[in-house]
């Protein structure tokens, strides 16, 4: 007999409404060369790889992300260089923002899902979005790696050479 998921379907809230800053910058030391920055334009859903050359910013590449993809990418970028727990990703995915209350609710839901034997079903929508996000972050030389029974972490993609200016 198939078990039913505890997940309630919600559309992620746009970061445009939740975030006062329209463009967020991430230096990601260890993932990007010195002087390189990722700029996430939350209203447009674009992630740009920037470098400053001759005191002028230059864009090396850019990728477009959906709202759902931004909802899982933001907590990963915020957590770097540390891992991002499953409950934080689930909270951000479901509500568009990983507040302490949302994280506590997600932690409880995941514990209940684990006890009911439907943990995989509960996390499947997040994993599907992470899979699409992973394909896009690879163009920046960034891998989204799974840590068994813990969460996800951003890592340098092996054999990736960052574009020259």
Model regions: which residues?
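Short glycine/proline-rich turn/loop motifs
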Residues: 52-56, 109-116
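Short boundary/linker motifs that mark transitions into or out of structured domains
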Residues: 2-65, 69-70
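Short, charged/polar micro-motifs that form catalytic or ligand-binding hotspots
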Residues: 58-63, 79, 116-124
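Generic structural signal for short, flexible, solvent-exposed coil/loop and linker residues
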Residues: 54, 72-73, 78, 133, ...
């Amino acid at each position: 007999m198939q078990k039913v998921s505890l997940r309630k379907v919600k559309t992620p809230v746009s970061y445009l409404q939740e975030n006062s800053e329209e463009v967020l910058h991430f230096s990601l030391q260890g993932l990007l060369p010195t002087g390189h920055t990722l700029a996430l334009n939350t209203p447009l859903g674009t992630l740009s790889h920037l470098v400053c050359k001759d005191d002028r910013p230059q864009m090396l590449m850019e990728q477009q992300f959906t709202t759902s993809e931004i909802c899982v990418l933001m907590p990963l970028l915020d957590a770097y260089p540390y891992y991002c727990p499953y409950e934080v990703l689930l909270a951000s995915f479901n509500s568009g923002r990983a507040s302490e209350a949302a994280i506590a609710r997600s932690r409880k839901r995941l514990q209940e899902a684990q006890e009911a034997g439907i943990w995989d079903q509960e996390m499947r929508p997040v994993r599907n979005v992470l899979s699409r996000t992973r394909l896009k972050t690879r163009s920046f030389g960034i891998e989204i790696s799974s840590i068994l029974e813990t969460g996800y972490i951003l890592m340098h993609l092996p054999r990736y050479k960052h574009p020259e200016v």
